[in-house]
């Protein structure tokens, strides 16, 4: 494996190489490559988001984050269908992420929930056909981030331009990297494979209904940063209940641990470098291959931003409450939904047998 090829590995792949190292020299080499990868990734991410902030305004730095997520994911990931159709779908996804979160913010929580359901239905049914590629961690997360950091007026006009540029970049990179791949399925196959009795479709419907419902309830309760609850729910919803229960536990424990670590750093470090706690969290995520540790370090960046608006006590309280609410609601909702679907299937089988 070349140096460049090793740089392309994810955290799990890099750590697997470290475990398999037979000599100290080999282990040190793989560790060096791993650290270079993290440093290069952090530097590139910082530079990329900074460029978007300069071009489209600080309030639109989140656009840089969303575009960066899409570029890094879809340069390798696909939608499982013909490349040309996938490219057009990606362009449509960017239109949805640009327009629908903004419109939903102008509506009441209930009407906003209905619009969010319609928007997520397109993103998930056509962009997240394979749950184990975790495209929802890009598309739905991007949607929720843009929803949570909404802007108006001139700033929204700049957001339109930034998202248009992001769509062009993502579609170009995606098509270039996938144009020579052969896919037997097309858009029509995705529609035909919609089956309410399959674990995939039930998972998709849970994402489509549950995440907007969580946002709506949080907003009706006047809870700031409702997107945190939505992101927590999205992250926890998986096709199998055993996996989902594991994620709920890790999300709750990880967030509480992350909050404690953040508070310790907040009081130990001088106020002039508080903003760098978020960068430290990003490095931690880069070093983490397991979901629980990622939940710990993701807390750093969220709290570093929220503390400026709500103070330490308010930000910490919101983070814990929103995350616990999001994952617990998702677990209860999906448990009931999966149970109802299984009962419906049993009824259909019984009627057919008679």
Place the predicted regions along the sequence by residue.
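Alpha-helical transmembrane segments and their membrane-interface boundaries
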Residues: 1-137, 141-297, 304-354
């Amino acid at each position: 494996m070349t140096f460049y090829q090793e740089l392309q590995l994810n955290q799990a792949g890099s750590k697997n190489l470290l475990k398999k190292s037979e000599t100290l020299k080999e282990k040190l080499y793989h560790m060096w490559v791993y650290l270079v990868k993290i440093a290069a990734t952090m530097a590139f991410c910082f530079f990329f988001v900074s460029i978007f902030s300069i071009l489209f305004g600080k309030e639109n730095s989140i656009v840089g984050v969303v575009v960066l997520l899409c570029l890094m994911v879809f340069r390798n990931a696909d939608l499982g269908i013909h490349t040309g159709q996938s490219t057009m779908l990606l362009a449509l996804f960017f239109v949805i992420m640009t327009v629908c979160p903004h419109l939903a913010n102008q509506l009441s929580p209930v009407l906003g929930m209905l619009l969010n359901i319609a928007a997520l239905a397109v993103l998930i049914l056509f962009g997240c056909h394979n749950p184990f590629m975790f495209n929802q961690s890009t598309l739905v997360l991007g949607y929720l981030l843009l929803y949570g950091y909404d802007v108006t007026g001139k700033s929204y006009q700049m957001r339109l331009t930034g998202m248009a540029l992001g769509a062009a970049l993502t579609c170009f990179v995606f098509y270039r990297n996938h144009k020579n791949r052969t896919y037997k399925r097309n858009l029509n196959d995705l529609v035909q494979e919609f089956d309410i009795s399959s674990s995939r479709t039930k998972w998709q419907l849970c994402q489509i209904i549950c995440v907007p419902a969580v946002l709506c309830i949080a907003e009706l309760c006047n809870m700031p940063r409702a997107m945190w609850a939505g992101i927590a729910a999205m992250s926890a919803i998986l096709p199998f209940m055993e996996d989902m229960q594991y994620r709920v536990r890790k999300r709750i424990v990880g967030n509480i641990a992350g909050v404690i670590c953040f508070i310790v750093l907040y009081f130990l470090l001088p106020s002039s470098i508080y903003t760098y706690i978020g960068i430290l969290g990003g490095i931690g995520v880069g070093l983490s291959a397991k979901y629980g540790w990622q939940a710990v370090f993701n807390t750093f960046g969220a709290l570093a931003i929220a503390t400026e608006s709500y103070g330490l006590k308010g930000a910490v309280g919101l983070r814990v409450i929103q995350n616990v609410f999001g994952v617990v609601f998702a677990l209860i909702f999906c448990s009931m939904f999966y149970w109802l679907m299984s009962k419906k299937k049993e009824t259909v089988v019984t009627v057919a047998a008679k």
